[in-house]
A protein has these predicted regions:
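Structured C-terminal helix/loop/strand segments within mature extracytoplasmic catalytic/sensor domains
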Residues: 2-82, 87-94, 99, 106-112, ...
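Penicillin-recognizing serine hydrolase domain
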Residues: 61, 87-99, 199-349
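Active-site-adjacent loops and short helices of periplasmic peptidoglycan-processing enzymes
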Residues: 52-54, 58, 63-70, 74-237, ...
Length: 349
């Protein structure tokens, strides 16, 4: 073969190899482009599918949800407000006493006041304080005390009421206390005062101290029994305060509400002394009221300047009341009007 033919064959072969190489490259590029396009398409389709799964269109999907029916709530029961009670109107027109004050113990409400804060003489209502202080200072009610002539004679000579103990007679503290509050015995007051404080004067100082402690601002005591003295005075409001405090003491309350009592036997009185409450005696043995209430107890007082007085305790419809009346005259039959006044006031409740 000639050299020129050989050269031509060689060039032809190289050209064929180049063309083949170009075809391979073009094919690879086309395949790469197709592959890239396929990848892009897959990614695009996958994104749309995720969007369709996670966020469905409100237009294409309807969610059915049952809404519970609202129940009508039963109306909450409300308490019917209690009617406001009308204020009590206690008339004083039918009273014979010139001084009177009615106190409701539950709330210290003064329901009636007829000169109840004006200065007045307490007479034997004084003995409420005397008995109270003796009880607070002599806890042993069975303690023996001998009554002396000095404790009896002055009171007797002044015409004071007496319990009936004799000079030299030895009796219990309990007997003396009943002697103070039931028959209003002045000698019993003196005997207790001497035992507690050593003298009546020293005991009176204790009485005035106690009055100040209780807020009895318009009260001043001079005697232990209530015998008249111009400087021995109080108001019926102060007496009501005193009695309210005193009845909180069980011993005082028991004695104050007792109609009668017999003292212990002594040589002078082998059968004891029969003591009776002056208030219960004037009630005629009938403490009941027309409205179903009852007068539970009381302490009377009688003295020229004070007239007839009464500090009483009543229970009406489950409520307790204290009524203090004073400067009442005798009725035509000689019975003090204080009992009629007490019934008149209490029956209005």
């Amino acid at each position: 073969m000639s050299s020129s033919n050989k050269n031509r064959n060689t060039r032809s072969e190289r050209m064929r190899r180049r063309r083949r190489k170009k075809r391979i490259i073009r094919g690879g590029l086309i395949l790469a482009l197709i592959l890239a396009a396929a990848i892009v398409l897959v990614i695009a389709l996958g994104g749309k599918q995720e969007e369709g799964t996670d966020s469905p269109s409100d237009e294409n999907i309807t969610i059915s949800q049952s809404v519970p029916e609202e129940k009508e709530e039963d109306p909450v029961p409300t308490d019917t407000p209690a009617p406001t009670p009308e204020p009590l109107e206690i008339s004083t027109e039918g009273l014979h006493s010139d001084y009177a004050l009615l106190l409701r113990l539950r709330d210290d409400a003064v329901l009636m006041d007829k000169a109840g804060t004006e200065q007045m003489y307490p007479a034997s209502m004084t003995k409420i304080m005397t008995a109270l202080l003796a009880i607070e200072n002599l806890p042993n009610l069975d303690e023996q005390i001998t009554v002396t002539a000095e404790e009896i004679n002055p009171a007797y000579e002044l015409g004071a009421s007496m319990a009936g103990f004799n000079a030299g007679e030895t009796v219990t503290v309990r007997d003396l206390l009943y002697g103070v509050l039931l028959p209003s015995g002045a000698e019993a007051c003196a005997a207790l005062a001497d035992r507690v404080a050593g003298s009546e004067t020293a005991f009176v100082d204790l009485m005035n101290q106690k009055a100040q402690e209780l807020g009895m601002e318009n009260t001043h005591f001079v005697t232990v029994s209530g015998l008249h003295d111009p400087n021995h005075y109080t108001t019926f409001y102060d007496i009501a305060i005193l009695l309210k405090y005193a009845i909180q003491n069980e011993t005082f309350r028991t004695i104050f509400t007792t109609p009668s009592y017999t003292t212990s036997a002594t040589e002078d009185h082998p059968q004891g002394i029969a003591l009776g409450s002056t208030m219960f005696a004037q009630l005629g043995g009938d403490p009941k009221l027309d409205n179903g209430g009852v007068i539970e107890g009381g302490k009377t007082g009688t003295e020229d300047a004070a007239g007839h007085c009464l500090a009483s305790l009543a229970l009406i419809d489950g409520e307790e009341y204290i009524l203090v009346t004073g400067h009442a005259p005798d009725s035509p039959d000689g019975t003090p009007y204080i009992i009629a006044d007490a019934r008149y006031v209490y029956n209005q409740l």
